[in-house]
Amino acid sequence: MDVKRGPILFRCDGTPDQGWESFYHCLSFAAALQRRRRGTHFFSYLEPLSLAQVIHRGNNDWAPAETLLGSPGDLEATIRQARRLHATAVVVAGSNVSPDYLKELRKTGITVLAFDTDAAIKHPGHLVVNPYLSPGLKAYKFELGTQLLLGRRFALVRGVFRRQRTIRATEQPGPFRALVAFGDDDFGNQARVRTEQLLEMPKVDKVSILCRTHHPHYHELEDFVGVNKGRVEIVTETKEMMTRLVRGHIALTSGEACALELCCVGIPQLTLPTKPAHLLNAKRMDDEGAATFLGAASDVTFDQLHEAVNIVLEDPMERLGMSRCARNLIDGRGGDRIVNGLEIILHSPQYREKAKLKLVA
């Protein structure tokens, strides 16, 4: 088996119950692996099935999983898939992963990389990656031999955001445009609630909602845009997103992955987190000066949001300072650094010897 050219297997799911965040983390990482000419294969349970087109569009292969990650029978199916592909590494991403699951994968001789943004389990694998700013090293439990890649240097940023980083080196003139990006797991429909509030603010001329077509309330957002045509739009395509990123003056986010991608571009942000992991991330962004943390989304009132928006839009130096801090915080090279960490392990003499002995069909 040639370790240098072996493919990478991704075990992740994307469903309404478990969310799609970990799935898109894997897609971003797969794009970085392909830049190193690594084959990428997804073994995933997807809902809706149209997500398979997203996988294929990124030049990845996909095999449907019959069960959810961590459910009975999934471990055996994942091992069979890894042996069929002669995979050199398995990337596992999901909240239902247990230490025993990762330990059994490691016993096969495959390198195990796990995405974990919650630090909820003790990790026995080779690599643990947290693409968020928090939690930090002290929160994680891991066994001897496990390497951790945590923090801002390993934030995953899609190519569309990296390409706009240089173009948006200077802010565009008014009127002011706002971006609303609460991610795909916006089950409380904060995107619509906050967009309605932004439309009531005289300083905001237009609002662009960044989301995907499988957003839990996508059809409601479409109806809302139809009523407010001219001032509100939904942006789902990459080509449309490129122009909106350059023109945006302020963004409302929940502190998730898209918030860090907007930091790479340099757009000032107001964060209203909806999840504990996002809460820690949003607070760190505020500490670094890249965003203003307003509090949990359920607690922020219209008056608080209105005051925060006015402060940012009325002061160009405030926007400039936030933009510079954000660009210094996230440089867009996190995916490549994670690939480097994985390649170092794959090329180590200890791993190559174990892989030859253990990974048998």
Regions found by a protein language model. Name each.
Residues 246-258:
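Acidic donor-binding loop of glycosyltransferase active sites
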Residues 10-20, 25-34, 38, 45-144, ...:
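Active-site and donor-binding regions of nucleotide-sugar-utilizing enzymes
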Residues 124-189, 217-219:
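A nucleotide-sugar donor-handling region in carbohydrate enzymes
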Residues 331-361:
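C-terminal alpha-helical cap of glycosyltransferases
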